[in-house]
Amino acid sequence: LFTDAVLAASEYLDIRPVYIEKDYWITRSLKLMAQNPNSDKAIFKGGTSLSKAHKIGNRFSEDIDIAISDGDSLIGNRSKMLIKKIAKEMTYGLEEVVVQGVTSKGSRYYKAMYSYPNVLGRAIKETVNIGQLLVEINSFANPYPYVSKNIDCFIAQFFRKTNNEDLIEQYGLEGFSL
């Protein structure tokens, strides 16, 4: 059923299926982060946020960039603990893939690759890693100003545009504020 939704959304929106699938997993991770009690400190930023939140261009990226607001005010190990907690919660159910030269987990910076259950396969060469998400979180960027925006996935947009709103709720694809 998921594969059918990905392929139908791909055809309707004229976006390659691998990007529809990756968008679902990026949006899922962001939704998990938004449900975190510390989500008010986690600011979605970078190129992917321009596409997902601000609807500027169709950027198909593999990374989720997060900045911790007021990171300089976190004393001692609190920054690292907060970053680790947010990363763990937003990647729930995904498998970390340790990549030499990519994976980095410092006191103020976290960068790790995660694999998701890819239903479309890995045979197609793409500009992004099929079946993987890169999560980057830091507490030294200055994420100001920022504004909360509604986020949803391409599959939900497809369901909405084809008058299938009931499927959005049925499959838990409701938009959320971040």
Predicted feature residues:
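Catalytic cores of NTP-dependent nucleotidyl/adenyl transfer enzymes across multiple folds
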Residues: 8, 27-31, 95, 99-178
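Short, conserved acidic/polar surface loops in the N-terminal third of protein domains
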Residues: 53-57, 76-81, 146-148
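Active-site nucleotide-donor binding segment shared across nucleotidyl transfer reactions
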Residues: 34-64, 69-70
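Metal-dependent nucleotidyltransferase catalytic core
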Residues: 68-104
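Short, compositionally biased low-complexity segments
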Residues: 1-6, 56-65, 129, 161-168
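Short, low-complexity, polar/charged sequence segments that are solvent-exposed and flexible
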Residues: 62-64, 85-88, 153-158
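Helical scaffold of the NTase/Pol beta-like nucleotidyltransferase catalytic core
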Residues: 1-43, 82-86
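Glycine-/proline-rich flexible loop or hinge segments
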Residues: 8-14, 64-74
